Amino acid sequence: MSTDRNVAALHDAGAQWNSGDLEGYLALDDPKAILQGYAGVEPGLPSIRRFYEAFWAAFPGSRLTFEDVFASGDKVACRFVVQGEHRGEFQRIPPTGVQITMPGITILEFRDGKCTRRWSYADSVGLLQQLGALPSR
């Protein structure tokens, strides 16, 4: 798959996220995909699905914006921002109603049109501070 098609697949996944279609978002991933950077996510689509279902339950209707996207060979890298309202339990934190903004960076590796590995690093400390679970800096 060309770098242009990989970038297009990422943008399509983002559009699916923003339309509320988790299955459409997850269509980007290979069934044996690996998501690195978040604790407790085992290899494979079932574990990745559970991770995102928990996030969506806590931040329903969240928006995903890709700020920068770069591609080379079979890899796509992007800087992203997730914004939403904390309306469900998140990591044992009851809903706060707080509007959150969580920036991050992800690198995706593609094979045969599917993401096989994703390295994602988001500002989890900043998110927990916004939710009042950690003191502000």
Model-derived features with residue positions:
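A solvent-exposed, acidic/Ser-Thr-rich amphipathic alpha-helical stretch
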Residues: 3-8, 22-76, 80-86
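Low-complexity, intrinsically disordered terminal/linker segments enriched in charged
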Residues: 117-137
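Conserved functional loop/turn residues at catalytic and ligand-binding sites
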Residues: 21, 114
